[in-house]
Amino acid sequence: MFPTHRPRRLRSSETLRRMVRETTLTSADFIYPLFAVPGEGVAKEVTSMPGVYQLSIDKIVEEAKEVYDLGIPSIILFGIPTDKDNDATGAWHDCGIVQKAATAVKEAVPELIVAADTCLCEYTPHGHCGYLEVGDLSGRVLNDPTLELLRKTAVSQAKAGADIIAPSGMMDGFVATIRDALDEAGFSDTPIMAYSAKYASAYYGPFRDAAESTPQFGDRRTYQMDPGNSREALKEVELDVAEGADIVMVKPALSYMDIICRIKETTDLPVAAYNVSGEYSMVKAAALNGWIDEERVVLETLTSFKRAGADLILTYHAKDAARWLA
């Protein structure tokens, strides 16, 4: 005797499948990362990230207009300065590359939400996310002195027009410090999207080519999270929420969907997932070799992040995905 319930009944046509679909992906879910460099007319493709470019500010503005026209509501800016120093001056100077890019984008596309990555690794000669002890080659960042740099960076970015401040350095207390600095400077309405559960991942390799931020010695395991930990992620989120975060993030996304799911179950705040460079480049490499259907794999992957609980997805696939979803 056949069963009374036949799940295939609701899979019999595309229209019916769409009607009962539990998770729907849209271009409004995306935040598109952009890499700003000095100069004019610069569009230099990142070798390890096909289709991703380092862009001068005039080209950033062109991209921003295209992104907005595709229905993508937000970008996040990363900067590659001309000069680097131990005080990460390029991160917090009012004439820094991210500050200039944020101002230019907001003037050209005021409706587009501009997030600013608030970190220091692109701006230091050693590639670590803050101050180091003199002579220390382990990469152990001095936490509290670094917080002062993050305060200045966040305020400078907000003054330049950034709509969202996104601290990514995984310093203890960085959300509270930045919240206090923003409030003190008159930016109490500027939200913080905290990289709350940022793992010390091997998936970041291509990004470090794009941002020119590879550590020159040591690694980042003394401040980014151990990939084997999940309870620690919940603690990090709990701390960031208590300190005033408005959005919490999991990075990377693909290997950490269990973390996205657990965090979504513990907080009412929006949860962002960062579909990182290594995840992107693996898909691009396989697609360029004809091994996979790029469109289907990308949309399936992004849908899975949302199904796991992500409200927002930072992804280099954003423009392509928006076109495919249109």
Swiss-Prot record:
5-aminolevulinate 1 binds at residues 208, 220. PROSITE patterns: D_ALA_DEHYDRATASE (PS00169). GO terms for cellular component: cytosol. The keyword Lyase applies. GO terms for biological process: protoporphyrinogen IX biosynthetic process. The keyword Translocase does not apply. 5-aminolevulinate 2 binds at residues 277, 316. This is Delta-aminolevulinic acid dehydratase. The lineage of its organism: Bacteria, Bacillati, Cyanobacteriota, Cyanophyceae, Synechococcales.
